[in-house]
């Protein structure tokens, strides 16, 4: 009987692993990491930055709202300068006497188109600015008076229009109380002549006036 020995390399090896020191869990003896406290001045800095940003946003929204309100009130308000200017220009352009004084080249089929603009800052027509001059005043009765002037130009002549309007109690549009045009070489022409104030004299006694005059 012959015994054969197996080589050692062919014998399977069994390896033993120890879990000692390789546990993923935390033992009861380990200390938890301490969280660092944020300094007070860091918190104050963050709070200050947030407050400043909030104020800037709120301020920007407020300024934008005011600007938008002013633009809309100027463009669409009946008492705004734009609406008042357009009404005055239409009224002056439709006046036949004004067109004659400006020597407009009108025919039965077509009328010359006039140019209306504000002040002449420079003599150069290409670079001059043309803002409309307008002011407002409150009289002793609490009514607002609107004063405006602008130029009206034809191909041959140039005139300066003066306008006065007063806020109306019946409607939202101011009423024109005075409007005239000055043209070089021509007499002043009134499109709307202002009404003269009536002076009421007190009753007299024995032919002599009693008391002061009242306007």
UniProtKB/Swiss-Prot annotation:
Source organism: Candida glabrata (strain ATCC 2001 / BCRC 20586 / JCM 3761 / NBRC 0622 / NRRL Y-65 / CBS 138) (Yeast)
PANTHER family, A to Z: MITOCHONDRIAL IMPORT INNER MEMBRANE TRANSLOCASE SUBUNIT TIM21
UniProt-recorded name of the protein: Mitochondrial import inner membrane translocase subunit TIM21
Mitochondrial intermembrane side: 77-215
Domain of life: Eukaryota
GO terms classed as biological process: protein import into mitochondrial matrix
Family designation: Belongs to the TIM21 family.
Entry-linked InterPro entries: Tim21, Tim21_IMS_sf
